[in-house]
C-alpha cells in the first residue's frame, strides 16, 4: 500500500481530488435545464452543501495548505517556489534533467512577447485587455470600483490600484518581469502587429529574460509549473457556495474573500520600489461591515476575476453564472476603442457558451446523444 501523504508533490492526492469535486459540484449547482438556452434556472442547495463539505473536511481542516505569503510566489520558476503551500496540484515541468529539454513547459512559448535583444519577434499571444487592467483600479477605501471601473482607463499617476495588477500584467512604462533592463514601451518593438492587439503582456506565465529559466531559441520554454488548482481558488469557491446558500454564513464568506485580499495587500516584494520609482499608488483593503447576499455575490465575482486573472477561469465562471453573453458583448463594444480586433466581435447567447458535441461522437451514439445549443 502506498501512503498518499508520502507521494511526491507532483502527483495529485486526496486534496486535489476534493478540490476537483468541489469545483464540479459548484458548476453542477447552477442548473441550466432549458434545452434551448443556457439560462440559470435554479440553484441546487444539495450541490452547494457539497462544495462547503469538500472544501472544509478534505482541504481546509486537513491542514498542510494555505495562501503563499506573496501572490507572486505562485508564478515563479525557481525550485523553492514550485509545489508550494498554495498549490494543490500542478502540471510538472523541469530542465537540466538529462533530456533534451523534453520536460520543459513549451505550452507558454507563444505567449512570450517581443523582448528587444532576446526574442526579437515573440508571438505575443494571450494579451491582457484594457478592461482587465481597469478592473484593478480601487477607490480611496482600497475597494474595487465594482460598477465604474471601466469608465476611465487606469492612470498610474493618479489612480489607486490593487498591487496584483503589477504582478499580473506587464505594462508600458514598467519593467518586464521586474527586470529594469527591459522597460516596456508602447511601440512596435514590444507589441505584435504594430499594437493591433494592444500593448499589455501577461506576467503570470512568463519569466525573467536574464534569469536561468528561459530556454531561448526558435521557441521559448521554461521549467515553470502550471498550477491547476490553488488554495485561493478553494477559498473563493467556498465563499461562493456560502453566499448562494444564504443560510446565515455570509460573514464567513466575506472573511474568506478578505483572506485573499489581505494576502494581496502584502504582495509587494517584487514591486517594493514601484510607488517611489514609478509613482503608482497601491491601495487594497479588506471589506468591513455586513453585506446582503446580492452585494456579497458581486464582491465574490469581482474577486475571482482579479485574483485568477489570466488563469483560464473567467470564461467558465461567466458561463456558470449565466452571464457570458451580457458581459462579453459589453466587453467587445467597449474594448474596440483600444483594440480594433474587437470591432466586429460578438457573442451569440445560447450558442457560444458551449462547443457542439463533435460530429464523430454524435454519429457513434446511434441516436442516443442530443446535440447541444453550441451547434444551433
Locate each region found by the language model.
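Acidic/polar-rich alpha-helix caps and helix-coil junctions
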Residues: 1-106, 141-376
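Short, cationic low-complexity segments
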Residues: 108-135, 188-195
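Glycine/tryptophan-enriched, flexible segments
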Residues: 131, 137, 141-144
Amino acid at each position: 500500500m502506498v501512503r498518499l501523504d508520502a507521494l511526491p508533490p507532483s502527483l495529485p492526492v486526496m486534496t486535489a481530488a476534493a478540490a476537483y469535486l468541489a469545483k464540479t459540484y459548484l458548476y453542477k449547482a447552477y442548473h441550466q435545464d432549458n434545452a434551448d438556452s443556457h439560462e440559470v434556472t435554479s440553484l441546487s442547495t444539495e450541490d452547494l452543501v457539497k462544495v462547503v463539505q469538500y472544501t472544509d473536511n478534505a482541504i481546509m481542516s486537513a491542514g498542510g495548505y494555505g495562501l503563499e505569503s506573496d501572490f507572486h510566489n505562485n508564478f515563479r520558476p525557481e525550485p523553492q517556489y514550485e509545489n508550494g503551500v498554495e498549490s494543490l496540484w500542478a502540471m510538472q515541468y523541469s530542465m537540466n534533467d538529462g533530456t533534451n529539454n523534453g520536460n520543459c513547459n513549451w505550452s507558454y512559448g507563444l505567449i512570450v512577447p517581443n523582448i528587444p535583444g532576446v526574442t526579437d519577434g515573440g508571438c505575443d499571444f494571450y494579451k491582457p485587455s484594457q478592461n482587465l487592467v481597469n478592473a484593478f483600479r480601487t477607490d480611496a477605501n482600497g475597494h474595487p470600483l465594482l460598477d465604474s471601473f471601466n469608465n476611465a482607463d487606469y492612470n498610474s499617476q493618479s489612480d489607486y490600484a490593487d498591487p496584483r495588477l503589477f504582478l499580473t500584467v506587464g505594462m508600458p512604462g514598467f519593467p518586464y518581469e521586474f527586470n529594469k533592463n527591459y522597460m516596456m514601451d508602447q511601440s512596435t518593438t514590444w507589441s505584435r502587429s504594430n499594437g493591433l492587439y494592444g500593448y499589455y503582456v501577461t506576467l503570470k506565465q512568463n519569466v525573467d529574460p536574464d534569469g536561468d529559466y528561459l530556454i531561448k531559441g526558435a521557441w521559448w520554454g521554461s521549467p515553470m509549473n502550471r498550477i491547476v488548482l490553488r488554495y485561493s481558488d478553494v477559498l473563493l469557491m467556498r465563499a461562493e457556495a456560502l453566499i448562494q446558500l444564504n443560510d446565515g454564513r455570509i460573514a464567513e464568506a466575506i472573511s474568506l474573500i478578505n483572506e485573499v485580499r489581505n494576502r494581496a495587500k502584502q504582495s509587494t516584494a517584487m514591486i517594493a520600489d514601484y510607488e517611489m520609482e514609478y509613482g503608482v499608488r497601491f491601495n487594497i483593503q479588506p471589506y468591513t461591515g455586513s453585506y446582503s447576499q446580492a452585494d456579497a455575490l458581486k464582491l465574490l465575482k469581482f474577486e475571482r476575476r482579479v485574483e485568477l486573472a489570466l488563469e483560464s477561469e473567467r470564461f467558465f465562471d461567466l458561463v456558470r453564472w449565466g452571464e457570458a453573453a451580457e458581459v462579453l458583448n459589453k466587453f467587445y463594444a467597449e474594448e474596440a476603442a483600444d483594440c480594433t480586433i474587437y470591432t466586429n466581435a460578438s457573442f451569440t447567447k445560447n450558442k457560444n457558451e458551449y462547443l457542439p458535441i463533435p460530429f464523430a461522437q454524435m454519429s457513434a451514439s446511434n441516436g442516443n446523444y442530443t446535440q447541444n445549443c453550441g451547434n444551433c
